[in-house]
């Protein structure tokens, strides 16, 4: 590699060094060559024709390049004059804020922020240019090779409308870079270019506020002139307020001659103790104030003026005095008068103390959505919003095309016809915008077309007066009360030369839906027209009828009273069908609908209710009979006997043994012994009538009778055929005598047999009902007594059986057998 020449600026002799490392033997010769080389002349210029980077030194030597050898190149050289000085202040100020928050765990106060900003503005130019060159080198690496020359052409203004595509990251999105060495913050590449070349202070999270123009079609474009910042209407108004020359603030104070070199300056303006020839004031870095005084030293009063335009320029591109906070007063600064010269308004200071960039070729760029169809000038500092608003972050700022920004644009526009705050932005019909006046375009005119009143027109008009305003067959949406809207076809034969074809009416009536559709919202708030495209179409007309009728006329939604007179004429609601008619209320119904509603009411009336919404409503009584044939299981009637179910001769239907009985063989007379023991029980109670009636009911679904075991097995001589077995005692019985349950012996231990079918009469129940249990009678437990009881049961008289085999059998009378047993 060919060695390059380096110049040591700090050395007065202007000695040079070679880029390549020489050997030890050639070191003396190199030192002699360096001593004999003369310094460059004062008119020596850069071979790349770059502008002056720094001011001349005391020895008259101009610096070749303020940055290192590896950063030098035509890309950086050509873009460096266009870098804004405010970019250096902004990036370093944001980094200082983050360091302060990490170190002290609190944000910077206003005084510290202003002091840091003043320090950054008074940094050496070499540091600023070196920082800008390094940042441009990073940007060069992230731009595609084919677009590097296009980026230079876009920045210098020769081709600002071309997209510059950057290199995407791993996810295919905009790449982020750090703008400082060892910085803890990364910035989007498009944000960096806007801050560098347009001087707009943006946060690292302001990427959502970027708006791209219509010409920018690539999402990775970093051309700063293709992007603008969407702002609120208040921001645009404040920018216009600061640009106005009439907004200077003038304050008059008595002169303080005690201070010769320094003056006391209050941080907050507006108080009577402010005395300053020139100072930078403000509550924050974004609201820097520049105060200037009159130059007359011997004047009795000091006039302090505040120019917002110079204040903003001081922050964005100028310099401020290096102020030191006073120890005596915390809210004041000690300002040195020798630094006042650094605060004069100079446009060159907006670009890193370098010559200003050449005048760019401004070209009109059409943007859709701008006020009064004006064309926006795409210049270097254009901050106008684009045509399309992104959907993200809509809640944080208004759209550029909103009414608020439209009014602000009118205020911002320069000219003599500037509007006053609070005045209307609407112009009279005879006036038009200033842009149209300048371009010579005709102004907009307001056209007012009065609506004709057909009721007040003269009746002696021509017969074809209404031909263009009405159709022969008109569709209307009718308000039918609480049942929704109904489409109606109205035939108008007035002033018609030709008779309406009957087929049109037939098609309209056949396709008309006369059944009102129920809607979710009340009819009074919703009027549905037939031409609306939704799933609830009230009028179904075929396509042929729509073609024949044409596009003239419109659908009407009349009031309910007018429709009642239209549909129901003298209560004769004939709607082209003999089965459909219109009620007095205006509802269209039919006989089938009425019959269907009546049937639904009967079904609802017969259907039992099982929900207990109110405690006062008595629940329905459960019946032992099935309500419907489809019901397979019905709960039995809960009977409340006088005695407990465990001690009763016949257990309760809801009593269920907790232990499954074992099926054992019973002896011949074991069942009769059980009956005898229960008959001679010491309880001495009488069975209830309802209990016995439930027992002999054939339709009863009690567990005792559903098992197939009945008293007919005992009365018809089937005792000998019973399966012998022992009775099972319930372990959980609460009876004092430990009596057995008859349901266990008869309902579970007896094989299935024909169920008992008896008549539900009082005479049939009287013998069994009159059974009395004697107190203290010894139970018959001997075999002889059991045999005698069995014989008495077999010899008991049986009632005459009816000749009809299907007739119900009479109950067996056991009274004689029991009397013989007692004897």
Swiss-Prot record:
Keywords from the named record: Activator, DNA replication, DNA-binding, Nucleus, Transcription, Transcription regulation
A single Gene Ontology CC term: nucleus
Comp. bias intervals (Low complexity): 10-25, 777-794
Localization (cell): Nucleus
GO MF annotation: an example: sequence-specific DNA binding
Family per similarity comment: Belongs to the CTF/NF-I family.
Protein known as: Nuclear factor I family protein
Provenance organism: Caenorhabditis elegans
Lineage: Eukaryota, Metazoa, Ecdysozoa, Nematoda, Chromadorea
């Amino acid at each position: 590699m060919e060695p390059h020449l380096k110049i040591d600026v700090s050395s007065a002799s202007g000695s040079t060094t070679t880029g390549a490392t020489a050997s030890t033997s050639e070191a003396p010769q190199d030192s002699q060559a360096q001593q004999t080389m003369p310094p460059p002349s004062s008119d020596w210029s850069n071979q790349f024709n770059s502008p002056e980077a720094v001011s001349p030194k005391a020895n008259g030597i101009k610096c070749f390049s303020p940055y290192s050898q590896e950063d030098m190149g035509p890309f950086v050289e050509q873009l460096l004059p266009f870098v804004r000085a405010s970019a250096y202040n902004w990036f370093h100020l944001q980094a200082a804020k983050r360091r302060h928050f990490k170190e002290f765990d609190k944000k910077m106060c206003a005084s510290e922020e202003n002091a840091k900003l003043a320090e950054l503005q008074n940094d050496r130019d070499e540091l600023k240019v070196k920082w800008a060159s390094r940042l441009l080198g990073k940007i060069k690496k992230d731009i595609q090779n084919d677009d590097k020359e296009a980026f230079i052409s876009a920045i210098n203004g020769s081709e600002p409308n071309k997209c510059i595509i950057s290199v995407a990251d791993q996810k295919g999105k905009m790449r982020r870079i750090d703008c400082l060495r060892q910085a803890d913050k990364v910035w989007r590449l498009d944000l960096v270019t806007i801050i560098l070349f347009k001087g707009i202070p943006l946060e690292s999270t302001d990427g959502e506020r970027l708006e791209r123009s219509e010409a920018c079609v690539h999402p990775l474009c970093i051309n700063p002139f293709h992007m603008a910042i969407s702002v609120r209407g208040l921001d645009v108004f404040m920018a216009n307020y600061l640009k106005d020359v009439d907004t200077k603030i003038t304050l008059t104070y008595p002169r303080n001659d005690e201070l010769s070199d320094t003056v006391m300056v209050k941080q907050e303006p507006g108080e009577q103790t402010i005395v300053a020839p020139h100072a930078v004031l403000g509550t924050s870095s974004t609201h820097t104030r520049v105060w200037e005084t009159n130059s007359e030293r011997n004047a009795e009063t000091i006039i302090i003026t505040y120019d917002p335009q110079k204040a903003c320029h001081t922050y964005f591109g100028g310099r401020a005095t290096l102020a030191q906070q006073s120890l005596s007063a915390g809210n004041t600064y000690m300002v040195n008068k020798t630094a006042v010269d650094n605060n004069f308004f100079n446009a060159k200071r907006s670009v890193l103390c370098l010559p200003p960039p050449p005048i760019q070729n401004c070209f009109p760029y059409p943007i859709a959505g701008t006020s009064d169809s004006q064309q926006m000038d795409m210049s270097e500092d254009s901050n106008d919003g684009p045509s399309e608003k992104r959907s993200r972050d809509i809640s944080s700022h208004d759209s550029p095309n909103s009414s608020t920004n439209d009014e602000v644009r009118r205020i911002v526009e320069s000219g003599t016809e500037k509007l006053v705050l609070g005045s209307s932005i609407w112009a009279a019909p005879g006036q038009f915008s200033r842009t149209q006046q300048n371009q010579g375009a005709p102004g907009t005119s307001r056209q007012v077309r009065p609506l004709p009143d057909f009721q007040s027109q003269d009746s002696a008009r021509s017969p074809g007066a209404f031909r263009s305003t009405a159709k022969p067959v008109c569709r209307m949406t009718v308000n039918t009360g609480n049942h929704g809207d109904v489409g109606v076809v109205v035939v108008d034969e007035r002033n018609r030369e030709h008779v309406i074809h009957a087929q049109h009416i037939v098609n309209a009536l056949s396709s008309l839906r006369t059944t009102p559709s129920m809607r979710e919202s009340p009819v009074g708030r919703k009027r549905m027209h037939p031409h609306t495209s939704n799933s609830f179409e009230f009028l179904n007309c075929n396509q042929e009828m729509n073609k024949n009728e044409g596009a003239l006329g419109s659908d009407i939604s009349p009031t309910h009273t007018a429709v009642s007179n239209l549909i129901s004429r003298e209560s004769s609601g004939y709607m082209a069908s003999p089965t459909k008619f219109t009620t007095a209320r205006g509802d269209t119904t039919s006989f089938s609908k009425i019959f269907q509603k009546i049937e639904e009411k009967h079904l609802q009336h017969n259907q039992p209710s099982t929900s207990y919404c109110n405690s006062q409503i008595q629940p329905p009584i459960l019946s032992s009979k099935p309500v419907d044939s489809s019901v397979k299981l019905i709960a039995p009637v809960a009977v409340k006997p006088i005695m407990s179910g465990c001690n009763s001769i016949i257990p309760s239907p809801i009593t269920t043994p907790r232990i499954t009985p074992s099926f054992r063989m019973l002896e011949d007379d074991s069942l009769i012994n059980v009956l005898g023991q229960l008959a001679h029980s010491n309880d001495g109670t009488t069975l209830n009538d309802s209990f016995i009636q439930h027992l002999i009911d054939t339709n009863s679904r009690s567990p005792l009778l559903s098992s197939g075991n009945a008293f007919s097995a005992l009365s018809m001589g089937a005792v000998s055929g019973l399966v012998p077995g022992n009775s099972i005692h319930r372990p959980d019985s609460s009876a004092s005598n430990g009596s057995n349950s008859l349901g266990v012996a008869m309902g579970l231990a007896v094989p299935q047999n024909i169920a008992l079918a008896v008549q539900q009469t009082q005479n049939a129940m009287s013998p069994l009902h009159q059974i009395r249990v004697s107190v203290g009678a010894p139970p018959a437990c001997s075999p002889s007594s059991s045999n005698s009881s069995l014989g008495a049961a077999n010899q008991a008289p049986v009632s005459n059986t009816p000749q009809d085999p299907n007739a119900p059998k009479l109950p067996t009378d056991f009274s004689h057998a029991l009397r013989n047993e007692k004897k």
